[in-house]
């Protein structure tokens, strides 16, 4: 299976002679669960990856045959990272099948460093404007393109698909520099949000 977000029934796990394998888009044991790419970006991780592992009764807990790491760029969105991993991690499955045929045994996952990546719900991606700008940026990138981070202004919900944190040398209008948390400042081509 590939990026399967559920559990295979126990009675089916032993049906294939060599068991089941799954291609999972995280560096296990970090980010077990349904939304590993999104959760990695939201947490500010600097790297992600993919693992091919043997399925067991517990979610994403089986021993690992092969893995690969990719850096997460400072502007990378979940959609972009998913596309990259779908393209570059696929050969891991073919190599794993060759390993199984050759009798290679998978390596058990560490019991340390386990994190869970639950499915993303709309409430998980609501922007708290009192948060630090970097946290908001991670949230927006992790939720882009879907489900999309959102905020409310005048009782209207709107999605934000791209953000960029201002840096010390950036030139901005004085109204932007003094914006309070939650205050929006519009210029001709940009919209700025004051953060906590």
Give the ranges of each region predicted by the language model.
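Donor/substrate-binding cores of folate-linked one-carbon enzymes
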Residues: 3-116
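Sequence-level motif detector for i,i+2 pairs with an aromatic at +2
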Residues: 47, 61-62, 122-124, 155, ...
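Active-site-lining helix/loop region of Rossmann-like oxidoreductase modules
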Residues: 95-152, 159
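An anion-binding loop in the catalytic cleft
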Residues: 129-196
């Amino acid at each position: 299976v590939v990026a399967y977000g559920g559990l295979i029934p126990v009675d089916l796990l032993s049906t294939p002679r060599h068991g089941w394998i799954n291609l999972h888009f995280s560096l296990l044991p970090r980010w077990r669960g349904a939304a590993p790419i999104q959760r990695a970006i939201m947490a500010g991780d600097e790297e992600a990856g993919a693992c091919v592992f043997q399925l067991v009764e517990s979610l994403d807990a089986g021993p690992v045959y092969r893995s690969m790491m990719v850096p997460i760029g400072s502007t990378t969105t979940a959609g972009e990272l998913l596309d990259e991993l779908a393209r570059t991690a696929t050969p891991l499955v073919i190599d794993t099948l060759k390993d199984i045929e050759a009798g290679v045994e998978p390596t058990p996952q560490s019991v340390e460093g386990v994190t869970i990546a639950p499915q993303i719900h709309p409430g998980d991606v609501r922007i708290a404007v009192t948060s630090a700008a970097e946290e908001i940026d991670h949230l927006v990138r992790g939720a882009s393109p879907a489900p999309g981070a959102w905020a409310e202004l005048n009782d209207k919900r709107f999605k934000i698909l791209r953000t960029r944190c201002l840096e010390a040398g950036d030139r901005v209008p004085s109204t932007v520099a003094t914006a309070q948390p939650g205050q929006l400042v519009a210029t001709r081509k940009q919209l700025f949000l004051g953060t906590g």
